[in-house]
Amino acid sequence: MTELELLGPRASGEPLGTAVLKAVAEDFQVDEVLDIPLSGQGEHLWLWVEKRDLNTEEAARRLARAAGVPVRSISYAGLKDRQALTRQWFSLHLPGKADPDLSRAEDASLRVLKQVRHLRKLQRGAHSANGFTLRLTALAADHQALDTRLEQLKQNGVPNYFGTQRFGHGGGNVHDALEWAARKALPEQRNVRSRLLSAGRSFLFNQLLAARVADGSWARAQVGDLLAFTDSRSFFPAGEAECADPRLAILDLHPTGPMWGEGASPAGAATAQLENAVGARQPALCQWLAQAGMDHERRILRLPIGGLTWHYPEPDILQLEFVLPAGCFATVVVREVVDLVSAGQTDSPCVF
């Protein structure tokens, strides 16, 4: 499956040129934002860890081995890219135990930067945001046009697509999810099951968002929509008055789309018709998600880009810095600006 099939159309027009992302790990830096005051005491040891070209799950296994505890005793808030330089929190459950020597887990790809005790473990999804520093190299685009486009994105946000990372190489996770859905079965392995359910659900959301980008309604509230604030999981229906709420214009409040699961969508009017039409194209997948116990949830259609700044360290390098809510993808910001090409191959798209 192509990127266009997995995501959907761009909202800002054609890309302004090409660039390379992730030529080296330092070109894609992620810092987890966690707004939890740590007490300094308790049976959970929280670790602030820097990883280079190492995925979150492998880092967790290495930390658990070094601490001499089962991997189920280690927790993290979210998964981070492997091909990147990332800093994120982990927690180890160590009731009645002293702080372990974690030096055996450390090498060029993993460093423990800080250790703090706390009363509770780190919960999945506990982080509020991720801060990104991206260096786009081999840049072939006009700086003035880039500045204009980036100012536009700063003011308007971008479609909140799930990035291609969610779907595996060539959309392989979506293909697998569709096959399992057709058989009305679930993989036995928990991590495989979770990955495929997530991919199938994300694919359906992107299909809905693609339709609203195509008709221009992705950033505009309409009667029947369900609205949500940027950092809230709750939502409320939009009538005429809600569609005129000034918080929509300042990117605090947004229309939402469905994360398919058990139960009907509470949306109304044209919004409900479109959501039902998208679901009707993949009935087996929708039923599979519901039968797997997934609840119907909502995700904002528009992604506000917090604190977006940029500069050009060299004429052919664009450096971007910004903050995104947890669960959102930096690459969907970049695709609204330039086409990404792989290092050493300037004529073929890069898949992350």
Curated annotation (Swiss-Prot):
GO biological process: one example: tRNA pseudouridine synthesis
Enzyme active site: D81
Keyword Isomerase: yes
The protein's Enzyme Commission number: 5.4.99.27
UniProt GO cellular component terms: cytosol
Catalytic activity: uridine(13) in tRNA = pseudouridine(13) in tRNA
GO MF term (any one): RNA binding
Keyword Isomerase: yes
Broadest EC class assigned to this enzyme: isomerase
UniProt xrefs under InterPro entries: PsdUridine_synth_cat_dom_sf, PsdUridine_synth_TruD, PsdUridine_synth_TruD_CS, PsdUridine_synth_TruD_insert, TruD_catalytic, TruD_insert_sf, TruD_pseudoU_synthase
Entry keywords, A to Z: Isomerase, tRNA processing
Domain TRUD: 157-303
Protein family according to the UniProt entry: Belongs to the pseudouridine synthase TruD family.
Family matches, as HAMAP family: TruD
Free-text function comment from the UniProt entry: Responsible for synthesis of pseudouridine from uracil-13 in transfer RNAs.
Protein name: tRNA pseudouridine synthase D
Organism whose genome encodes this protein: Pseudomonas putida (strain GB-1)
Gene: truD
